[in-house]
Amino acid sequence: MIGRFIARNYTTSIFQESKRIVESTTLSNGLKVVSLVGGYTGPAVSLGLYIKTGSRNETQETAGLNQVLKGLAFESNTNKLGIEVQRDIEVSGSTAFAQASRDNLLIALQTLPNRSLQMLNNLANITKPTLPYHEVRDVTEIIVKESEAYNHDSYSSIFESVHQTAFRGKTLGRPLVAPICNLGNITKDAVTNWVNSTYKPSNMILVGVGLSHNELIEEAEKVTFGNDESSTSISNETAQYIGGESLKYSSGNSKVVLAFEGTAQSNIKDVAAFSVLQSILGNGCPKTAPGHGRTSRLFSLTKNNSNIVNSEAFNLTYGDSGLFGVVAEVEGATVGKTVSLITSEIVAASKTAGQELERAKAVTKSSVLEQAESRTSALEFIGKQAIYTDKVLTPAEFAEEISKVTSEDIKRVAKKMTSKKPTLVVVGDVSDAPTIESVQSQLKL
């Protein structure tokens, strides 16, 4: 009898993966609804609300308000007290998080299908905060501590400098984490004005993974998101890449970043090409496991140069611009030598073809599809596209775009990015740091 029971369970546990499909609809109130269905085992739903606001939209006076909104995400609103919001999420067995970036704010939940309407209500309620004084005060105090920790992280600090230098302190160059001195000046009125300017249906994208599109629309139409009667709006200046250099003396190993303007998220063809170029360069970490970039150019570079502790290519995309480059940690007064080696690898990578190109494309596709196995990662993947473009690709469709990348595409994007002034940031021993002009002279493609 036990044997028959076990056999019966095995015969009913086979899962046939279905094709993943993205659908998008804009409701009458301006709210954009995007869904990804198919291809996931287990009964779970991920819901996310993207708000088109980030540190790039802040000013000198409003710096830090985006962080405050993130901190207030699960606090009191017009329907529930903060403790009720948090308990509601916990009791339902759901998980939630909020994250602020340079050009968007994401509030997300993962729950069971039978709780989806309840959690969707919670998402909608978040966009109608009551902002009691003590909550604004407490959240601001927490953010001050987060800012202190962020500023003490060497890699976070250097990427702040990269953005600030590349965009000359405007738009994407504004600090992701506001200066601590500014956070102490934030008032409830300032937060209220920011809420009224950002929490509007036309400024939001609702993303669902694991819930049918029609069901998501039906449930979204039952609730109210934000204030669609607000006439206020935030500034939305177009990002202008400028480039330049920033040198800061510090003891210990030196950190070097050589960056260029990348591509905007909306340019899918170039996003695919830059993603492959990133895989060609890869990373140079002594602990890199087989199959995780040990054939990349930067791995070989780091392995063959004892002064380079580690190195890694990065590719950051935003709504209207991006940053592509290499970050490295080096020992001694070898910054100049390291930058020359990096420029040589970039020039060589621009000429990649044949087996090396195919291997880089395979690595890139594997990374994209592996990340998509997580509902939350898939939500972020399609949500970020939905903010900036009407055409949203599934992970598999983006993998197809990667397959189409040719050696000419790699050469084209590499030539395009190196045609503008690079951004060079050095923190450490700056005694032999090269000039921007000398770096440019080495980038002849």
UniProtKB/Swiss-Prot annotation:
Pfam families: Peptidase_M16, Peptidase_M16_C. GO terms for biological process: protein processing involved in protein targeting to mitochondrion; response to bacterium. Keywords: Mitochondrion, Transit peptide. GO terms for cellular component: mitochondrial matrix; mitochondrion; phagocytic vesicle. Belongs to the peptidase M16 family. Substrate recognition and binding subunit of the essential mitochondrial processing protease (MPP), which cleaves the mitochondrial sequence off newly imported precursors proteins. It is found in: Mitochondrion matrix. Residues 1-13 form a transit peptide. The keyword Transit peptide applies. Heterodimer of alpha and beta subunits, forming the mitochondrial processing protease (MPP) in which subunit alpha is involved in substrate recognition and binding and subunit beta is the catalytic subunit. The keyword Transport does not apply. This is Mitochondrial-processing peptidase subunit alpha-2. It comes from Dictyostelium discoideum (Social amoeba). The gene is mppA2. GO terms for molecular function: metal ion binding.
